[in-house]
Amino acid sequence: DLVRSRGLGDVYKRQERYLHLLSRGDKIGLTLIRLSIAIVFMWIGLLKFVPYEADSITPFVANSPLMSFFYEHPEDYKQHLTHEGEYKPEARAWQTANNTYGFSNGLGVVEVIIALLVLANPVNRWLGLLGGLMAFTTPLVTLSFLITTPEAWVPALGDAHHGFPYLSGAGRLVLKDTLMLAGAVMIMADSARDILKQRSNESSSTLKTEY
């Protein structure tokens, strides 16, 4: 029994060490969240300058009451859609006339700026806070696509499983933006906490100087 008790005690101590180690991972986790958000916005933002990526967001933009006005002919998008890797000159010409690529380029610039602001947090917390706010706002718009975009749901092509709650591939990608939303809240809170801490330190230094 004594040997068994000692063995259990050793296991308990090892668990304690691992738990203490994991409990200190919040700062590392925040850094990883910040880097992940920056990577996603930077990578996808740069892809917005490539025609296939611009083409892929056409259904979302064309059906969105917040964005469709950026397109010249949003109501005609379905007959001009292409698959990734597919090249159709007539579809490409329509997308050009539709301002698909002009809008996508502008969106790409915004997304790259968000990534840079998020990465700027160690240098300037206010820039990091702004980046977090923009990263938070973006998923609010994209998640609305689940309501406005028919292509977000499995179409009725004969299978019994279609419509709500059966998300299509596009819908499943949009749903993952809930993680972006939560991550943005975390990095905003982290930046705000650091700003308040800096202000507190400055106030303390000022009081010490006065007295």
Model-based region annotation:
Residues 47-54, 121-124, 148-158, 189-203:
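Juxtamembrane transmembrane-helix termini
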